[in-house]
């Protein structure tokens, strides 16, 4: 289903690429609204969606396969500016009577694109004869281009690496300008959006805020809304936005599982009840959660237990709010996109999603999802627009099950206290060193391992604590953060001296893949 908006918008047709969302990110970063729709729905919704331009994504298939994802001529014949990427370029050539062949040496990784002709696609870049660093990932390649097209860029493995039909404003690239390895990829997208498609770039968080406040009022009317507040960025921004729209028709329910970071529950209550004056039900359920988790070591069982208990507690509190007919959720655009894959097939379950699930069907609450059009970075920008402190909206991601998945093995109140104290010291030292905003996520893990140590003149036998910090752009892949050694050294010394129960600190230098960011 498309979103109704008065903004100029771009339709991104998804053919199953793992980086389709990066295309949307690049378009949004340029201030242009866009949506991703699967290839088999694109022609049906294009009239309703009324895009100002179209982008065809890459994909893992081959246009030479009988069951490859395809579209007909309709999108090419609309007279709209169109940009085709990788598989999209090959499909364009196949549909418009060019030629695609397999069996050639593919290109995978960094490549050099030689610009062969002045083109609005490459305005402000290396110039004719100049070289741009791009990212290739293709096996098949175009060997003949459709009538009306000309070559504007070549590479060693792709003689038609960039082609154009200037009259029809249709451009096709064999490489991926959306990935950061393509050095001037963002500039290429801006060239397409502004120089070629003539868009204005009217997508801002200030405009979104104003429009969404009105949409919430129109949807809710005089109804009452319940919002499950976790203290995380998404639910917090959603709550503040909804409260701006409907005031005290919103009630937030904050379930303290006892598995939050140090002092986090108090901070949430202070911020929302005292600062924003949002009606807030604070449920201290720590004893319940820790009691149910006693003796549980399997990580999946932990997640499911926490999810079940959260729903039970939330359900009981929600039932006490008379007349509530709406449930607010902090659903983001990646959640919406991932629910409909281009190929329609299942993906392997690595582990249950961190965010605990929905409420029982019998509650029959209608959903209010004010953030469902936004990416995470846009949610943070909206939070600042709404007056939330940059330090709050810039906090690192925190999993729904909380510290439970940062304590491998059995969970006890004593272990939670040790981890809370150690984690707080770690994050404090990162902030003191001015490194917090350079890191995607940083946290401590209390291991189910004890080692021998010496403190004072006495032998100790206490816990090992692992420190984890990674850099990432989207959480899909991650590299370990390269700390200055003095920062790690000071952090380890403070933890061992100030947190009773830890006598050894180690640093995790595993990237993703092969590891995941969280340990469980």
Curated annotation (Swiss-Prot):
Residues 203-395 form the GMPS ATP-PPase domain. It is an enzyme of class 6 (ligase). The active site is at 86 (nucleophile), 176, 178. It catalyses: XMP + L-glutamine + ATP + H2O = GMP + L-glutamate + AMP + diphosphate + 2 H(+). ATP binds at residues 230-236. Its EC number is 6.3.5.2. Pathway: Purine metabolism; GMP biosynthesis; GMP from XMP (L-Gln route): step 1/1. It comes from the Bacteria. Catalyzes the synthesis of GMP from XMP. Homodimer. This is GMP synthase [glutamine-hydrolyzing]. The gene is guaA.
